[in-house]
Amino acid sequence: METVDSRNKLHSRLRLWEFPDQYIIEPADGSGSSCLDISRVDASMKLIDQVPESNSVRVPKIRSIFGVVGMLKLLAGSYLVVVTESERVGSFLGHPIFKVTTLKVLPCDHSLKNSPEEQKKMETEFSKLLSVAEKTTGLYFSYEVNLTLSSQRLHEMGDESKSLPLWRQAEPRFLWNNYMLEVLIDNKLDQFLLPVIQGSFNSFETAIGRDIVDITLIARRCTRRNGTRMWRRGADLDGYVANFVETEQIVQMNGYTSSFVQVRGSMPFMWEQVVDLTYKPKFEIVQPEEAKRIAERHFLDLRKKYGSVLAVDLVNKQGGEGRLCEKYATVMQHITGDDIRYLHFDFHQICGHIHFERLSILYEQIEGFLEKNGYFLLNEKGEKMKEQLGVVRSNCIDCLDRTNVTQSMIGRKMLEVQLKRIGVFGAEETISSHLNFDEHYKILWANHGDEISIQYSGTPALKGDFVRYGHRTAHGVLKDGWSSLRRYYLNNFADGTKQDAIDLLQGHYIVAVSRDMAPVPQKGGLEAVANFPVALFVVLMSFWFATMSLKQTGSDYKHKHLFFSLLWTGICVGMAALVRANGRIFCNRPRLHKPRG
């Protein structure tokens, strides 16, 4: 695979000099290139020949960094985002891949000293979100190869495109720091522009007979409607869906390279599930009259990018999910044709909670589509022998747990087909017949599912023990119970702030002085005083006082204690009922505005 022109090659080793009034980013890879000078006063940038001299007044702090992710501008200051720690996790088509282990946000906000107090206060609120952003997980990058494109799309690129800087080759929807790079792009700093994807990257190498086979699984998360589980559901008016992830499985052996791509994404019409302290908030379809147009736009985009599309819907046909399932099926009746097909498979009804081997029923229904649309294959000379002509699009409600089990099954079946085509497997041979290979392959998909799930829900994937071990385990069931409780807590009491941080980082919310300095509308009624920790404290204390008073009813003042017991019980029940009836108000909700566009 050809890579970027050496003239546009990224700096792989950098040294950061933190002076009181400026940041200097010095290439430390022996290239002799210019240094990047960034003002800590106004965030202006320029290239300089060498690092300025230090003295007793200007003593710099020096550290190694591994890339410049970008810059964000808030009300008064700007903030530089850099990679301070990373680890190599494998290779993509022969090129090293690294995972971001630590992000650091560096303020360029000295001008804030002269700002009005109200502006300083607002700046502090926004900068707190950046500390949340520093904890972003699942970020990967390469200095040499474009991670945003699949193997097939990389192969189809022309020589002229391959000579461009990596950021210019990148697929914008999978470029996690697309918005943050804009300032650096404007300053023509190509060698400092590090493209980053969010998703997962896992690989392993194993021997099958005399052959060494390398298997890679890479996920690319779309940034168009990125967010948290409960605050990003369904689609927007442009047809971009929540939790859209492209998963590519690559096998390399004896010079052959073969890949197979699948996608997942939320049901492509407008629906929501707003948290309200209940375990399963009800589903609501929004603007149902727009559903057909939105779904049509979504699938036309998929067809343009991937070819034929088979939409596999895994949601329940009954209960709360049933309404969404019915709407999806109705919408698809107007869209399906030769190139777009829809198939419903009630995962829970057919497989229950333990019989996931029944997914073979689904495979029998989609096998024809997979055979017809195939996979991508290059021979030892780098010549294209096959190309993938279509894609399976899977979804459940979250596009996490059921989806990951299903995608791992499809990936396994297609890998066996690829290995037979390359000549590694015989006609009747399967992955299961090679125990070491089978074990590593299960772990590969389980880790993939966990990482995608953590980014969207905050916890590892449910049902992951089946993917990891091939069957359900008692430990896996207990782990799923704990993860479900954690999801409940995060959804209700943490994800609103996390959603704001995501929107800020990816440019879905642009900070503007004219808007963000305007007076905040005064909250009225219950919303002005709603505070869940305080309400919980009142409920618990009321319960405690009611219990203590009840214990004293046998004393001389039993009527008095009985009265207080009933009083505290009433307060306890009343507060609990108030919180339950107004659950949405007591939850942690996003505070920023609509996405741009």
From Swiss-Prot:
Ubiquitous. It is found in: Endoplasmic reticulum membrane; Cytoplasmic vesicle membrane. Its EC number is 3.1.3.-. Residues 130-458 form the SAC domain. A motif (Phosphatase catalytic core) lies at residues 393-404. It holds the Pfam family Syja_N. GO terms for molecular function: phosphatidylinositol-4-phosphate phosphatase activity. Disruption phenotype: Short, bulged and branched root hairs. Accumulates elevated levels of PtdIns(4)P in roots. The phosphatase catalytic core motif (or RXNCXDCLDRTN motif) from the SAC domain is found in metal-independent protein phosphatases and inositol polyphosphate phosphatases. PANTHER family: PHOSPHATIDYLINOSITIDE PHOSPHATASE SAC1, PHOSPHOINOSITIDE PHOSPHATASE SAC7. This is Phosphoinositide phosphatase SAC7. It comes from Arabidopsis thaliana.
